[in-house]
Amino acid sequence: MSRPNILFITTDEQHLRTLSCYGCRTETTPCLDALADNADVYETAYTVSPVCLPARCAFMTGMYPHHSGSISNIFGASLSLQFPNLFTELKKQGYRTALHGKCHFIPVPYPATRGDMTLEYEHFIAYYKLLGMDKLSLQDDKNNSLWYYDDYAKDLARQGMLRKCRYEAHENPENHGYYDFPFETPMHPDAWVGQRAVEDIESRSADENNFIWVSFSGPHYPVDTPAEYTDRIDENKLEPRIFREDEWDDDSKYHVRGYHGPGTTEGSGHAKDGAQKNYSEDYWIQWRRRYFGNIALIDEWVGKILDAARAKFGENLLVIFTADHGEMMGNHSLWGKNGALFEDVLRIPLIVQRPGQKEGRRIPETVSSLELFPTILTCAGAPVPDHADGVTLDEMVQQGGRPFIISECDNRAVILKDSVKVEYNRPNLRGKMYRELYDLREDPDEFENRFDDPRYAGTIRELTALLEAEPDLMETVFRPYADGGDYWLNDGTGAGFAFNGAKPE
């Protein structure tokens, strides 16, 4: 069989247990579940980062964030042009490449954003195209598409919809982290992305090698689900929230302020006094119905995309579905990713259908999102660059799975080995350093911080030594905040934007 066409489908901030093939009872993903019936379902897949940009740059390069420098959504962490990436390496093999939807390979200059105005985005678009995409339909996150003129925002503007969408997302006082999408469903960002992908697939030639990345920005907040999809979700079939009333009495935990307030993380921003403890149970029901409704919308488009790809390419098709990271989804009474290192955020769905595969398999071995870069390149007949920190999924499974997992973002890192995880964060501006340990064998829901339990002293030494064996990790993740000002990307005016690599003229 010739080199396969490759369809890479990703979502943003999707909890593992939103798919029935991963045990969800809400029944919102019939198309993905049908794919899983004839594919490899990886039961223990972890993201390399609990936030968007580092996770996505790892898809592109197969590198740990502390090796690529892409460690944050907000610091000097753009995807460098010096590293070979999926697009550049596949193009060398004759592939036509495309991305439809969210890139987020460059930190957004958040201080420059305005709720009442959409700003130009051409420097982002130019940079993305330097990464090797032959075709780009950019819908660069639900918020970014209202702050900046990407392709989706331009389409909203042409149809007179942009101002209303911007108001609902950023100015409407009734927006509490969720709202009903104010226009017809085809203009919802995830439907828009799905339609662009289908149109592109239908225009392709089956005689060419094609790599198409469909990158949905949902179900990431704001949860802007069309009412027709929210109405499909029976609150009595929602996954039960996992929480304990007294779990945040322990102030040794990193997210204690997010719960008690005033927190600065996503879910806290919509809560009274910045405290997520103030959300009522009805709030959680309404937020979660819309979250699952957004997933139902995406699933429909996944079905349409798969139908189009199979009609065009037949069985010579590699399909990979995953998410950049998970979502708290009300567990531990938090929503958002929050830079959290709970399993809710670190575990990701991963479904892989090889060309011609007709039977489903459950793969229990532990793998990382680092494995996707070498897997895709190897299937395309491309050599894997030496910089890659992962190996193919098949190789990792043959080795018995990853012996340990590291996941990181700009100020936090976690290491997981033998079901025990140790978490560290850089000392914050008040000098507080949170350290946490959870034993998933005894405490699978992660309620009890056992870092100071003497029974785990040896485990802490072992896992800390593994982290210290990564000097770049210790430098980038644990650099004191006082040293961080020189790599903040924006001076607050939008003029101080700096790239990690060459800036396009």
Where are these regions (language model features)?
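Short hydrophobic beta-strand that contains or immediately precedes a catalytic carboxylate
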Residues: L437-Y438
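A contiguous, mid-protein "functional segment" used to position or interact
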Residues: P454-D483
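Short, charged, surface-exposed hinge/linker loops at domain edges
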Residues: T476-G496
